[in-house]
């Protein structure tokens, strides 16, 4: 009985909606892994009238105090990385440098994974792990978390995680995170 209660408490907190708006505006949106999922999240931010600047390859030195939140669209695409002329190793280094700079600037960080199972695997997970560890909040399409990977990372990082059924449902919790 105690184990069941503990499981429900841990799982419930991992899937808890972000109840308090915490993220400042404007935001910077970037693609971690260079997948086309970036474009979908861009549309959702626009629809929800969240002011943001979109830069797929922004580097740490491109972050400044003018933006208050870093939104990371995670999911590796070999085609996207190739088109951007960047290796997975260079993308991981860029990601870690971005996260370090965001912390220095006291920016809020939101990780978004909308690619489902197709944007999982070793390459994507190497990018997802540091993003989740440095995030304040995460939103995931449920099909990308069927194995509980994001749930475990969110619990380890002690951050809220919202799971939605469809990409179109990401907009509401994403907008609600902004004050």
Language model features by range: what are they?
Residues 17-21, 28, 140-179:
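Charged, low-complexity C-terminal accessory regions
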Residues 52, 109-110, 161:
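Hydrophobic beta-strand scaffold residues
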Residues 82-105, 153-161:
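A short, gly/pro- and small-residue-rich
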Residues 120-152:
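Structural recognition of alpha->loop->beta junctions
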Residues 20-48:
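Short, charged N-terminal beta->alpha structural module
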Residues 45-66:
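A short, well-structured beta->alpha microelement
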Residues 91-124, 166-179:
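Ser/Thr/Gly-rich flexible loops in soluble cytosolic domains mediating phosphotransfer, phosphorylation
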Residues 2-13:
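Bacterial N-terminal signal peptides
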């Amino acid at each position: 009985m105690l184990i069941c209660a503990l499981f429900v408490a841990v799982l419930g907190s991992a899937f808890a909606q972000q109840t308090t708006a915490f993220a400042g505006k404007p935001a910077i949106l970037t693609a971690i892994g260079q997948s086309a999922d970036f474009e979908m999240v861009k549309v959702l931010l626009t629809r929800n009238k969240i002011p943001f600047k979109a830069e797929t390859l922004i580097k740490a030195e491109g972050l400044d105090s003018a933006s208050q939140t870093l939104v990371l669209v995670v999911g590796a695409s070999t085609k996207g990385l190739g088109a951007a002329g960047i290796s997975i190793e260079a993308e991981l280094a860029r990601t870690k440098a971005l996260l370090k700079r965001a912390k220095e600037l006291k920016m809020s960080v939101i990780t978004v994974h909308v690619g489902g199972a197709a944007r999982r695997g070793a390459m994507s997970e190497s990018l997802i792990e540091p993003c989740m560890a440095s995030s304040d909040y995460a939103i995931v399409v449920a099909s990308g978390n069927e194995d509980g990977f994001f749930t475990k990372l969110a619990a380890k990082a002690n951050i809220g995680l919202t799971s939605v059924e469809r990409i179109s449902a990401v907009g509401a919790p994403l907008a609600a995170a902004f004050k």
